[in-house]
């Protein structure tokens, strides 16, 4: 197992896979792709057709401010809608005692785009020129617009949270962290 080494080339030599990385070459009989947000690219290096592509979606969180933690004493999740690929915002109690609310789901402009300002032009180009993303947007136009609105407006994000906790107010939440979801999308 080799971690923290970006694979730049893969090839099969006999019954072994050779992975070339900045840390050197590594050989093994089996290849397990654990490249997360880059797994489609690593699969391409291994000779697989890129029929499915990873499109990065940033999930932004808010957290309850200190004086509002009593509003949520347990995990609170919405009933999933099987027609949509994302669960929707929810409340999660954290092990250290805090409570986070979220996430939304918006296109990240970089595969490691944890902030709204993170932009990687090749990653962004890869996403916006992919027909699978546009098929997704056409299938879920309302949800796409609402998720973007929630990203741009704390008030709109709070309104989504009020479906689960009606008494929550904009002043009860403050910006939290973010994650990036590796959303696998088919071309068609």
Predicted regions and their residues:
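A conserved beta-strand/loop element that lines the FAD pocket in flavoprotein oxidoreductases
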Residues: 1-7
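Extended, charge-rich helix/loop segments that form flexible
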Residues: 110-144
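Short, solvent-exposed secondary-structure boundary motifs
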Residues: 1, 78-84, 182-188
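Short, well-ordered beta-to-alpha junction loops that form the rim of enzyme active sites
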Residues: 5, 104, 176-178
